[in-house]
Amino acid sequence: MNAALFLIIGCAVLVVGYIFYGGWLAKKWGVDNSRPTPAHTMEDGKDYCPAKAPVLMGHHFSSIAGAGPINGPIQAAVFGWVPVMLWVLIGGIFFGGVHDFGALFASIRHKGESIGEVIGDVIGAKAKKLFITFAYLTLILVVAAFASIVANTFKATYTADGAVDYAASAANASTAIISIMFILMAILFGFFVYRRNAPLGISTIIGVIGIVVCMIIGLNWHPIYLNYTVWMIIVGLYIGVASVTPVWILLQPRDYLSSFLLYGMMILAVVGIVGCSPTVDMPAFTGFYDTLAPSGTSLGYMFPALFVTIACGAVSGFHSLVGSGTTSKQLDQEKDAKPIAYGGMLIECALALISVCAVGYIWNQYADGTTTTPTVVFATGLASMFSKVFGSGCYNVVYSMLILAVSAFCLTSVDTATRLARYMFAEFFVEPGKTREDLTGWKRVITNPYVATGITVVAGVALGLTGYAKIWDLFGAANQLLAALGLLAVCCWLGKVGRNNKMFYFPMFFMLIVTLTSLVFTIKAQVVGIMAGGEGVVWCYVRGIIGVLLVILAIDLVVEGIRALGRNKKAAQAAE
């Protein structure tokens, strides 16, 4: 395939989908810009705080992107570029965009509360508690994984005698110091924009220049060399503070400025791909079973592996937690929901297509196992194309910028996940129609923002230090189960309020089938592992039990959801 043509056609389809299907959704759902959003009606200067659309887009996009739209498409490339492209385009427009837009819209019509509260309203209190328990535990796993990724990106390398290997650690130390300076700059940005009313445009220009300055300083001055455990503790302290700090101080400005790293990364990628316009060796279709297994472990059958592996970039349950958790509390106007949620999803799809071009350009290195880490594949492929156009001298600079950008989004995602977990932890104890202010005794104490955050951070960091990777294989299915349940929740709510919800039927049931099939395969693999015995048998039991519990949870919530849809239909018929 020609990478430039592949990218241009894919992006054109996404633009058409945004204009026509996204516009149709907004019309059918009744987006009303005259209605005040929770950011205004419940403004508290902490969690509820209206943000200008570009700023909120920066937060939302930085939070949902992370490394997902890079890792997933590159790993799924073993099935060929045609299946990946079709799932990214169809999934993004008709699954992920609908899911993200719907979750945000439902939340702003529920006082900015999470998708769990929406489930409580339209399905029932039992369903709410089940969903929030599942979502909270999934977020703990996300915190553990992303904190670990950040710590690994920052950590020093040591020689055999225990001394710091400064040459080998320089790149990580640079990333760490750049990230620290970036956080400090974001705080200053937030102060001047929100407390000194500095013009956003001028402040943005200064902020982008500041990013470049931070990178130049960090690449030449990196005095901090710490091990993995110390960095995990530091990251834990950071996300703990960040998740309880008013959003205007850090979350909004940092995510907004971080988004320019991502936009810059995507611009570099497009310039490299279009300028180089390579014909790559990546096959269109390799078959319905992964026989390449470049990482050493086969993904198995294309169904369900393709639809679980490519989550961010097609449809991801984590997005519904972000949209209904932090984004809905900052949405200035209802009309902003479409570009931020639906548009943000499709931009992520474009990033997924760029990732396919990157792996395609170095396909032989990937297929033979020479270069298999998705982030390295992404940076190597794009930097190689860029340097082919502008000369080999720019390879190292572009490569470092791409690695830094991916690291920045992992840090963004981990503190957003911590804040979301804090919200959901408190919502679990609040009864329908009540607020946290109505709680008394130990429930009021444990749902205090600082206490809830402390519990979340300790659990996440502890899991990150003790081996989250042992259960990480379940995250793909768990994340897509979140997506199926998010689609179910919004579908039930739209039915309850008398709006068109038929666009949710197929995506909802398809994702449920994908999830259950994936979980059945996982459970089967754990049973085989248990029968074989050996050192890893304990973790086989753990993964198997978690898989069975997820299947039971999915079936229970879907049954309750179908009953709710039936009740809504009867109520609508009675009203007629």
Residue ranges of predicted features:
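Membrane-interface "cap" regions at the ends of multi-pass membrane proteins
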Residues: 16-70, 259, 301, 305
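Membrane-helix boundary/coupling elements in multi-pass transport proteins
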Residues: 67-74, 91-99, 103, 107-111, ...
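Loop-to-transmembrane helix boundary motifs in multi-pass membrane proteins
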Residues: 125-140, 343-350, 393-398, 427-465
